[in-house]
Amino acid sequence: MKITRLTTYRLPPRWMFLKIETDEGVAGWGEPVIEGRARTVEAAVHELADYLVGQDPRRINDLWQTLYRGGFYRGGPILMSAIAGIDQALWDIKGKVLGVPVYELLGGLVRDRMRTYSWVGGDRPADVIAGMKALQAGGFDHFKLNGCEEMGIIDSARAVDAAVARVAEIRAAFGNTVEFGLDFHGRVSAPMAKVLIRALEPYRPLFIEEPVLAEQAESYARLAAQTHLPIAAGERMFSRFEFKRVLEAGGLAILQPDLSHAGGITECLKIAGMAEAYDVALAPHCPLGPIALAACLHIDFVSWNATLQEQSMGIHYNQGAELLDYVRNKADFALEGGYIRPPRLPGLGVDIDEALVIERSRSAPDWRNPVWRHADGSVAEW
């Protein structure tokens, strides 16, 4: 069996799918994308195709090492996202060839169902509460919310009070009938994060995500030492070597690698094992499409320390396509009381509607991150 072609499809809302074809007619799908940098990742995928065409897709480990070590420069979001999507597609092919889901190739199930959570957007508490209630009616009781708007390096007591008041109102609306994490998106400096996290403690959020940027990861241990709230991070770390440093430094209670950014299934399986050795939970980051979610689920179902899985059903920025619009076997990804069952089909278990993918790719949006600015005109963290 040999790889014959790689084809990429940029799609609404802001995703990109990859199809890898073989000379035996078996094809695999992956999802290599950085939202706002899809064209850049697409170029990287096709540049890496030179290492893949003519090779046996079943030699996943060898191909992964070739893509990673075959150049002098390595790592980073662009290259690792390209490798991630390729890796997903290779596992999809191998599972289809052998007639089993990918999790069977990774040792089999450690659980029968996986708890998921929903991301709820909105800045006004009333909007957030309404969104949570709608999802709660559908069986969800775990959520993730924005922790705050962008903050300056040293910001005002008013900004801190506004962020805390918002969380207090949400907690008052639900009591302890729901759990929610707070995502700061690295928009807070370490001095402000210390103040803000301490003020949020009475409202007992499930976790505090990315209180500071991954580039400031040395702050995680210091922040964790000053609070009883679990600190989560990892969506902007791209290899086991980056995760190794934060695990050794301590401070993180939850790792959140992204299966479409951190080298795919091959790399994230290693990251999950490293996290377990440090008694750290796993909650893969996944605001993307169905292939990325399926890849996450295969890691979740073989990793004992996997606790929560993010998914993007109903997320406010899925404009132009919903999570399962490009999937034929939608029932296989049905949620039951906030839980999802293991994929049942061979490979990743996603039956992609290729005709729809081709059609929608003809009008793909060229989405870019908006530039935000502070009141003084300086650029704010996105």
Swiss-Prot record:
<feature type="active site" description="Proton acceptor">
    <location>
        <position position="285"/>
    </location>
</feature>
<dbReference type="InterPro" id="IPR023592">
    <property type="entry name" value="Galactonate_deHydtase"/>
</dbReference>
<keyword id="KW-0456">Lyase</keyword>
<dbReference type="GO" id="GO:0008869">
    <property type="term" value="F:galactonate dehydratase activity"/>
</dbReference>
<dbReference type="InterPro" id="IPR013342">
    <property type="entry name" value="Mandelate_racemase_C"/>
</dbReference>
<comment type="similarity">
    <text>Belongs to the mandelate racemase/muconate lactonizing enzyme family. GalD subfamily.</text>
</comment>
<dbReference type="InterPro" id="IPR029017">
    <property type="entry name" value="Enolase-like_N"/>
</dbReference>
<dbReference type="InterPro" id="IPR036849">
    <property type="entry name" value="Enolase-like_C_sf"/>
</dbReference>
<feature type="site" description="Transition state stabilizer">
    <location>
        <position position="310"/>
    </location>
</feature>
<dbReference type="Pfam" id="PF13378">
    <property type="entry name" value="MR_MLE_C"/>
</dbReference>
<dbReference type="InterPro" id="IPR018110">
    <property type="entry name" value="Mandel_Rmase/mucon_lact_enz_CS"/>
</dbReference>
<dbReference type="GO" id="GO:0034194">
    <property type="term" value="P:D-galactonate catabolic process"/>
</dbReference>
<keyword id="KW-0479">Metal-binding</keyword>
<feature type="binding site">
    <location>
        <position position="209"/>
    </location>
    <ligand>
        <name>Mg(2+)</name>
    </ligand>
</feature>
<feature type="site" description="Increases basicity of active site His">
    <location>
        <position position="258"/>
    </location>
</feature>
<comment type="function">
    <text>Catalyzes the dehydration of D-galactonate to 2-keto-3-deoxy-D-galactonate.</text>
</comment>
<feature type="binding site">
    <location>
        <position position="235"/>
    </location>
    <ligand>
        <name>Mg(2+)</name>
    </ligand>
</feature>
<feature type="binding site">
    <location>
        <position position="183"/>
    </location>
    <ligand>
        <name>Mg(2+)</name>
    </ligand>
</feature>
<dbReference type="InterPro" id="IPR034593">
    <property type="entry name" value="DgoD-like"/>
</dbReference>
<dbReference type="InterPro" id="IPR013341">
    <property type="entry name" value="Mandelate_racemase_N_dom"/>
</dbReference>
<protein>
    <recommendedName>
        <fullName>D-galactonate dehydratase</fullName>
        <ecNumber>4.2.1.6</ecNumber>
    </recommendedName>
</protein>
<dbReference type="GO" id="GO:0009063">
    <property type="term" value="P:amino acid catabolic process"/>
</dbReference>
<dbReference type="Pfam" id="PF02746">
    <property type="entry name" value="MR_MLE_N"/>
</dbReference>
<keyword id="KW-0460">Magnesium</keyword>
<comment type="pathway">
    <text>Carbohydrate acid metabolism; D-galactonate degradation; D-glyceraldehyde 3-phosphate and pyruvate from D-galactonate: step 1/3.</text>
</comment>
<dbReference type="GO" id="GO:0000287">
    <property type="term" value="F:magnesium ion binding"/>
</dbReference>
<dbReference type="InterPro" id="IPR029065">
    <property type="entry name" value="Enolase_C-like"/>
</dbReference>
<feature type="active site" description="Proton donor">
    <location>
        <position position="185"/>
    </location>
</feature>
